[in-house]
Swiss-Prot record:
This is Putative serine protease 42. Glycans are attached at N141, N177, N276. Belongs to the peptidase S1 family. It comes from Homo sapiens (Human). Its main location: cytoplasm. The gene is PRSS42P. Its EC number is 3.4.21.-.
Length: 293
């Protein structure tokens, strides 16, 4: 999570407003991208052990739940009042995706046995675990750590021209017990729409200054405003000196004045908006232009 001195921090998100195609999820290993925070040297953790490749698909109804369908999802006892460090229990669905105890990406608990993250965070070469229930990325005394049984990367995940379908689901080895610090977030139905200028929130343990090598120890949060598609595309095109449409259907942009946005290590975390006291995940941290620029 970065707080820079630029006039506007810009981040592209992958929308979760449509169910995944019902097809076989065979052998989908994500290519390496620069966004996840994988080791202190900036590369993947050399100690991570191999993991079996992604397997057949998860239940599609994970993507059709809505706040009204469950009294358990999307509720937190704490109100948002601002700040940098997230208060304990403010984001009970926040997950740290890890290899050998090292944080690489964020994630979100969507049921007792499923975690949602970014596709580019997952490789078939590694075993993963998830840590939840504590705002500290390192302290495991008060948190729950569960091994990942299977990983499913979206079958149409691609980095050609632009990043598409950057989603993955992690099936846990056993269900977690819900507590005040461990709760699932709500996932919107397909026809759900996010309006421009909606104030939403992103959280993560990513780098604070862009050039730092280590993740933030304490979970960070920052509010972001949803940007209209056309405006976002123009800004991205200008930044990349390109005339191509980089922002495509299935993406949404978030921005914050004064250069506050996500950074390496925040990938896979969620963009969540509050509706009628219920938190709904509308996007996943996928990619951006620098950190806090």
């Amino acid at each position: 999570m970065s707080s820079g001195g630029g006039s506007r921090g810009l981040l592209a998100w992958l929308l979760l407003l449509q169910p995944w195609p019902g097809q076989n999820w065979a052998g989908m290993a994500a290519p390496r991208l620069p966004s996840p925070l994988l080791s202190e040297e900036g590369g993947e953790n050399p100690e991570a052990s191999p993991a079996p490749g992604p397997e057949a698909g998860p239940p599609l109804n994970l993507f059709t739940s809505f706040p009204g369908d469950s009294l358990l999802c999307g509720r937190t006892p704490l109100r948002i009042v601002g700040g940098v460090d997230a208060e304990e229990g403010r984001w009970p669905w926040q997950v740290s995706v890890r290899t050998k105890g090292r944080h690489i990406c964020g994630g979100t608990l969507v049921t007792a046995t499923w975690v949602l993250t970014a596709g580019h965070c997952i490789s078939s070469r590694f075993h993963y675990s998830v840590k939840m229930g504590d705002r500290s990325v390192y302290n495991e005394n008060t948190s729950v750590v569960v091994s990942v049984q299977r990983a499913f990367v979206h079958p149409k995940f691609s980095t050609v021209t632009t990043i598409r379908n950057d989603l993955a689901l992690l099936q846990l080895q056993h269900p977690v017990n819900f507590t005040s610090n461990i709760q699932p977030i709500c996932i919107p139905q397909e026809n759900f729409q996010v309006e421009g200028r909606t104030r939403c929130w992103v959280t993560g343990w990513g780098k604070t200054p862009e050039r730092e090598k280590l993740a933030s120890e304490i979970l960070q949060d920052v509010d972001q405003y949803i940007m209209c598609y056309e405006e976002c595309n123009k800004i991205i095109q200008k930044a990349l000196s390109s005339t191509k449409d980089v922002i495509i259907k299935g993406m949404v942009c978030g921005y914050k004045e004064q250069g506050k946005d996500s950074c390496q290590g925040d990938s896979g975390g969620r963009l969540a908006c509050e509706y009628n006291d219920t938190w709904v995940q509308v996007g996943i941290v996928s990619w951006g232009i620098g950190c806090g620029r």
